[in-house]
UniProtKB/Swiss-Prot annotation:
This is Tail fiber protein. InterPro entries: CarboxyPept-like_regulatory, Phage_lambda_Stf-r1, Phage_lambda_Stf-r2, Phage_tail_collar_dom, Phage_tail_collar_dom_sf, Phage_Tail_Fiber_Structural, Stf-like_N. Interacts with Tail fiber assembly protein. It comes from the Viruses. One of its GO terms (molecular function) is structural molecule activity. It comes from Escherichia phage lambda (Bacteriophage lambda).
Amino acid sequence: MAVKISGVLKDGTGKPVQNCTIQLKARRNSTTVVVNTVGSENPDEAGRYSMDVEYGQYSVILQVDGFPPSHAGTITVYEDSQPGTLNDFLCAMTEDDARPEVLRRLELMVEEVARNASVVAQSTADAKKSAGDASASAAQVAALVTDATDSARAASTSAGQAASSAQEASSGAEAASAKATEAEKSAAAAESSKNAAATSAGAAKTSETNAAASQQSAATSASTAATKASEAATSARDAVASKEAAKSSETNASSSAGRAASSATAAENSARAAKTSETNARSSETAAERSASAAADAKTAAAGSASTASTKATEAAGSAVSASQSKSAAEAAAIRAKNSAKRAEDIASAVALEDADTTRKGIVQLSSATNSTSETLAATPKAVKVVMDETNRKAPLDSPALTGTPTAPTALRGTNNTQIANTAFVLAAIADVIDASPDALNTLNELAAALGNDPDFATTMTNALAGKQPKNATLTALAGLSTAKNKLPYFAENDAASLTELTQVGRDILAKNSVADVLEYLGAGENSAFPAGAPIPWPSDIVPSGYVLMQGQAFDKSAYPKLAVAYPSGVLPDMRGWTIKGKPASGRAVLSQEQDGIKSHTHSASASGTDLGTKTTSSFDYGTKTTGSFDYGTKSTNNTGAHAHSLSGSTGAAGAHAHTSGLRMNSSGWSQYGTATITGSLSTVKGTSTQGIAYLSKTDSQGSHSHSLSGTAVSAGAHAHTVGIGAHQHPVVIGAHAHSFSIGSHGHTITVNAAGNAENTVKNIAFNYIVRLA
């Protein structure tokens, strides 16, 4: 079941804290609450709050608008916690308050040692793993070294094979040298083949030299694979040269056989020797090529083995570094663990790690027992609470008055000491005394029993008789009434009693303690003129008891429930400067405000028209006035007048003409007949007698034509005029005259100035509005 925490949140000046949120953040798990969950409560404007909090431990955080959150403290709610304020729970003792500081420090040291031990264990595991990795890397390196050794052996074997190939090439060279010697002898036998034999001998010598160089190169390649391959290639090239030289020797020998038959046999032998030398050279070349290939393969294999070995060596170095780092980390963790253990030992030695008692410090165990007599156990807050609850039920020492019905154990009969005697013991003792009286006194016992064992029987009887009413007519009248339910006796006349109905209203009025209460019940009391919540005009700034000014302030709805019915919001209206208006039939809600204003209306304004008639100004003769003299000189007009004419139409037809031939063939041949006018298209001209008649002709008339005209003629006609304006004056006659002007009917703009107060008011007297608290 949840525990109610309620109260008023106040600041240091006692004022309620407004706009604040109370947050409860769970610090640990409980049966109903999960750790780190947050609950919140928003106090009202008066700072009041109320929360039903589940069992658990919470951090209290205050969040005020406009300020950062603040941690107010920690509260613990137990299953048997009593309702209270937040301050009560914040100020209550917690388990941490009852725990010694040295114990908390020791717990922290133990936690740190445990953490360091975990780190050491992890570091140890890492170190073992790194050592295993290093061992594996070492094995891989060893395997790579073995591979490199095998590769070196293979390279050495290849070098030996290359050396054998070189030796074979050398043998071939020696054979070639021998054949060259034979060729030299053959050359000596035939003088005609001397030069050829000498050339063959030189070539053989060169082959021998090259073979020796090839042998030396092959020997060198045994130590360096790359050099061996290069020199083997050189040997191959030299062998090819030897082959070419042998071919040349064969050619020269053949030439010698052609020149000298005697040397044919020698040349043939020389050719066979050269052929043998060529075969040997080819064998040497093939062997050299195989040696070069084997050397190149050995070089590649060696390079691969070296690269693999380098990679594995790098990996081994990295593993070694990792192992070194893991070892360093493990050593550092071990040192920290050792230091933590040392600190724990120091603290343990400081407190002796012994149980504390009343004479020495040490470790104590918590206990919730309330009946223990141990001096080595520490009481928990729960035990303290149980004792305090029990103590609160006891009477204080300075107030011996007891409440309720105290009890005490009943002592045995005959007990005679300072033990408290209860009523049972006293009653038994009295009975024993009575039973122990002589038989002669038994009559008193019987009389006392008959009188109810009242020791003050005489006084009781006297007092009872004194309280009796003497018998008279009034009592007789009352005794004669018949009793009935809800009847009230009254006297109609002297010694004459009657009954009347007693209603609930009558009983209520009779139950009142004062006249004011009766008037209040009847609705005629001092505070009954106005119902709770009605605004009352009050002619003073001093408010009567039971009333409050209406100034927009909040009130306690629980303390004044009737006032809360009128104002459910818990806030009174601010009536300062406001009047009360009856709520219209529609459009307004109760307690709604309406700003000041005037009813919308219009004004009519006009100005009467007035005809001012025709007015005449006064007459005045200005006489004759002369203007001032000024010579304007000679002025030229602007150059203008230029214009052009548009042309359109056509020219007259002209150009028609004809051509005369002037020559004509007559009967006696061509002759010149001079010039004559031809009136038609054909004319005859008579010449001399010897010339005969000549005929002249002309062409028909052709060539008559006309031209069309269009366009604009050239602009012309621009000219200017020179105008002379000499010095002169103009007389101006201004005679006596008057001016008339008409002012017709017209209107004027009228401005109406503002008037009135700052707000709409009527004649009034200022009162305070108060309201009755109820």
